[in-house]
């Protein structure tokens, strides 16, 4: 593993063109302004380098000199510590713990619903779609209180949530009624960030082709 990693003089991200976890990491890299190379990986055709570096052959996988990491949250926290500015986690331990809990809940609850919409039966997908829409609208008031997710500053929690919100049209979810204004305002603020725009692959841009 170390020999293969050492062949790369530039930080390299193995990334899926539409993989939501890869998208999280791409946002962090763009936010940090890090110079890196990207290797786009097709799901059923991993390159030999990835096979050699990661026994799971999963994306995202980050190679930084002799270090190889996989699992998006591990990569994101590593990048935030490796490149401290701008910070994407709070300074104080209590706030950091809360942020980690928010990321866990987003993945456990909302990403699970997303996967059910994509992979479940028609009835399962309909139920998950309804639940995800209702839960997002239920928390919408928090987006009217702060520019970002319970914070004045863009954070790793936003890097978790934004890729999911970007994919909502593809999931068949739209918003109207109470909470929609706040939620759409948050989405606009995040989607217009230079780092978010830079993070998008061509395939991800096409998810919202023709939409504002």
Swiss-Prot record:
Domain GST C-terminal: 92-209
Presence of keyword Nuclease: no
Induction: By amino acid starvation.
InterPro entries noted in UniProt: Glutathione-S-Trfase_C-like, Glutathione-S-Trfase_C_sf, Glutathione_S-Trfase, Glutathione_S-Trfase_N, GST_C, GST_Omega/HSP26, SspA_C, SspA_N
CDD domains: GST_C_SspA, GST_N_SspA
UniProt KW DNA damage keyword: no
Top-level division of the source organism's lineage: Bacteria
Keywords linked to the UniProt accession: Stress response
Example of a GO cellular component annotation carried by this entry: cytoplasm
Annotated transmembrane regions: none
Domain GST N-terminal, residue spans: 9-87
GO annotation terms (biological process): positive regulation of DNA-templated transcription; response to starvation; response to stress
Family membership noted in the UniProt record: Belongs to the GST superfamily. HSP26 family.
Protein function: Forms an equimolar complex with the RNA polymerase holoenzyme (RNAP) but not with the core enzyme. It is synthesized predominantly when cells are exposed to amino acid starvation, at which time it accounts for over 50% of the total protein synthesized. It is involved in the transition from P1 early to P1 late gene expression. Rnk and SspA can functionally replace P.aeruginosa alginate regulatory gene algR2.
Protein name: Stringent starvation protein A
Gene assigned in the entry: sspA
């Amino acid at each position: 593993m170390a020999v293969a990693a050492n062949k790369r003089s530039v930080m390299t991200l193995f990334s899926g063109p539409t993989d939501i976890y890869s998208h999280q990491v791409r946002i962090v890299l763009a936010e940090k302004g890090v110079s890196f190379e990207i290797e786009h990986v097709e799901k059923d055709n991993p390159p030999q380098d990835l096979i050699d570096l990661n026994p799971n052959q999963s994306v995202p996988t980050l190679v930084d000199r002799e270090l190889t990491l996989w699992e998006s949250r591990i990569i994101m926290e590593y990048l935030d510590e490796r490149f401290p500015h701008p910070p994407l986690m709070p300074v104080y331990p209590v706030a950091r713990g809360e942020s980690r809990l928010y990321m866990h809940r987003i993945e456990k609850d909302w990403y699970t619903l997303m996967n059910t919409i994509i992979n479940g039966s028609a009835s399962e997908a309909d139920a998950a779609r309804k639940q995800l829409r209702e839960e997002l609208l239920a928390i919408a008031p928090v987006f009217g209180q702060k520019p970002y997710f319970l914070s004045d500053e863009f954070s790793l929690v936003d890097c978790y949530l934004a890729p999911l919100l970007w994919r909502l049209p593809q999931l068949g979810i739209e918003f109207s009624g109470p909470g929609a204004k706040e939620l759409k305002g948050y989405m606009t603020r995040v989607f217009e960030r230079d780092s978010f725009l830079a993070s998008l692959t061509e395939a991800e841009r096409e998810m919202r082709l023709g939409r504002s």
